[in-house]
Amino acid sequence: MKHRVAPMLRGLAPALACLLGALTFTPAAAGTVDAVRQRGVLVCGVSQGLFGFSERKADDTWSGFDVDICRAIAAAVLGDSAKVTFVPLSASERFTALSEGKIDVLSRNSTWTLEREAGLGLLFAGVNFHDGQGFMVHRDLNVTSALELGGSKVCVQAGTTGQALVGDYFGANSMTVTVQAYSDAASTLRAFETRECNVMTTDNSGLFAERLKLAQPAGAVILPDIISKEPLGPVTRADDVAWYNIVKWVNFALINAEELGVSSANIAEAQRSAKPEVRRFAGADGGLGRMLGLPDDWALRAVASVGNYGEIYERNVGTGSRLGIPRGLNQLWSQGGILFAPPVR
């Protein structure tokens, strides 16, 4: 019996080798990336207007941290960071719009959770902003801690993780509050400003952004309490893994670029670098782009268009911006934070 099996296996070897060879370096299959190329434009879902993250200006152009992620993807895939159509979405609309194919990718301060990924058929393409839920109160309340908020009316936006977490937090601390949910960020902030509620809760970065919209920003205080982990990042549909990989690795490329010292100011030097890890990143060695179905210089395209992660952060939300948010956990792992990305190799 064994004498018959061995020749059979030897006969199958060439076919198996061909099959494995075909599977090893298959570029991105037909799907979202092909639709984006045929259309010539990336359709990216963003917020309806959040300072520092996705903000539409008077001339109808967009800017912000999440906007730059969209532009980086467009640069990697289409070679032009300007080829993006931005679709403003409320928290309640965002995942439905993605699931129904109305947008190619969601870059809208969205928290990665089990329910959203497994329950909604979505894939979160890594974390690009480590946040946490916080509280903003009127300064004249003289409150210094969330543990002093018993009996308060709390404003929260519907369709966010904060809506459930605020009840969990106060319940766990044996405190009673009245939670009022609003359909969008604008109405939530309006309710806070007109004192329909005396507390507003959302991601801490969002509180910094929303406070700037108040007629008297100095009249509001952001408390030091952080009551949750809110890992934010871009989102794709789960039915197109090739596209998910592209979005994920563009996200990772921006982080890796900062770690490698590659920025929008030294693209030419990166292309000539003698360092193996920089050469792989730049596409000079390795031919890694074809595994994603992209040109070998895909990562450099992204960085050239919007800068590395550090540049994006500081320009939009960092200490040099209107928001002035310290990097904190969003500092590189080698600099005291927890931000890191798998290597490009």
Regions found by a protein language model. Give the residues of each.
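Ligand-binding cleft/hinge of the Venus flytrap
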Residues: 57-58, 71-82, 124-126, 162-181, ...
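Extracytoplasmic small-molecule ligand-binding "clamshell" domains
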Residues: 35-109, 294-298, 305, 309, ...
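Acidic, polar ligand-binding/catalytic clefts
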Residues: 71, 75, 79, 83-148, ...
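Extended ligand-binding regions for polar small-molecule ligands
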Residues: 68-71, 75-77, 139-143, 147, ...
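Sec/Tat signal peptide C-region and signal peptidase I cleavage site
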Residues: 25-30
